[in-house]
Design a protein with these regions (language model features):
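C-terminal, surface-exposed recognition/capping segments
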Residues: 29, 68, 151-328
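Short, compositionally biased
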Residues: 1-185, 281, 317-319, 327-328
Length: 328
């Protein structure tokens, strides 16, 4: 698929290499087929230059979301793309800063410039909930509805794979509660060459405790409004968090795909932000979870004010979240 008609042209396969022409900034997924899709690659051409920002936690953090065009606060071009945990292929986020329950992902087009849809797997069977199907069907969001009570993974519960994004032991901690394992780039890691999905502790400085917070004064955010105080006046469809004493970065609230219904939660666009890490989440709360390295919201599903931020929580692997890469 391509994010705009005519974005990709001249696709050829020769001597084991794929060549193509790209007309301008945007996103695309190019696949090689032998009847069925054998493999696919995400092509990302942002408007702004990708760069790294140093952080208090010691990681060099990418300056925009994976798949974003730039990182301008209050601009939908900052949303980027959404990923089910462990999958390499993305889904489009909302086309507008805010949305409704009827909002679907931004339009995408096939090689003939016809609009195509992100579809979902069966909600009554897990027959297609396997890695081979995921690779062969990059535009299908895999639902966990049929196994929701036993696993929140998009893979069948007995096929769950903690190593998909390169950090199978990433949940292990020491006696001072520090994460022991940082992981490494994996075969299915969606980040560009030289970058990878971050470990669980990458944004622990974003709250005073390093954990769940519901008081804005406990968020390590930039004073965007310039009024000398931390408040919702500093929120612009996302927060600008301080990565270090000298660097901050905007993290947009691009919402997410719900893993059970395998559809974009469009009404939460601009209100909820969720970002994946590379580590599995301990199974004592629920099976099929992974670490979210950043989750925040300013309203609940009923539209009531509910301001929270968590830099290390659990999420369902079937949900599709944003990704903020770090330098390898």
């Amino acid at each position: 698929w391509q994010s705009a008609p005519g974005l990709i042209s001249g696709v050829t396969l020769a001597d084991g290499r794929i060549s193509f022409k790209i007309a301008g900034p945007g996103n695309a997924v190019i696949a090689v087929k032998d009847g069925a899709i054998l493999w696919s690659w995400h092509i990302w051409y942002p408007e702004a230059e990708v760069a790294g920002l140093n952080s208090k936690t010691g990681y060099e953090v990418m300056n925009m979301n994976l798949g974003a065009m730039h990182n301008t606060p209050g601009d939908v071009g900052s949303y980027g793309l959404l990923y089910q945990w462990g999958r390499k292929d993305p889904f489009p986020a909302a086309p507008t800063l805010t949305g409704t329950t009827a909002t679907v992902g931004a339009p995408i087009y096939d090689g003939d410039n016809n609009e195509i849809k992100i579809t979902n797997s069966s909600q009554s069977s897990t027959a297609d909930n396997n890695l081979a199907f995921a690779i062969a069907n990059p535009t299908v969001c895999l639902s966990n509805y049929a196994q929701f009570n036993t696993s929140r993974d998009w893979l069948q519960a007995d096929m769950s794979n903690d190593a998909l994004w390169g950090n199978p032991k990433g949940a292990e901690r020491n006696e001072t509660n520090d994460f022991l394992n940082k992981g490494a780039k994996s075969f299915y890691d969606p980040c560009p060459v030289g970058w990878r999905v971050p470990p669980a502790d990458v944004f622990r400085n974003f709250t005073a405790s390093g954990g769940y917070a519901w008081v804005i004064d406990d968020f390590d955010i930039a004073d965007i409004s310039g009024d000398g105080a931390k408040s919702l006046a500093d929120y612009d469809y996302g927060w600008t968090f301080n990565l270090s004493d000298s660097a901050s970065s905007y993290f947009p609230a691009a919402a997410r795909f719900d893993g059970s219904y395998a559809m974009l939660m469009g009404s939460m666009s601009g209100l909820w932000g969720s970002y994946w890490g590379n580590a599995p989440y301990p199974g004592d709360m629920f099976q099929g979870g992974a670490y979210s390295v950043l989750s925040f919201q300013i309203k609940d599903t009923a539209g009531n004010e509910m301001i929270t931020t968590s830099p290390a929580g659990g999420g369902a692997r079937a949900d599709a979240y944003s990704v903020r890469c770090i330098r390898e």
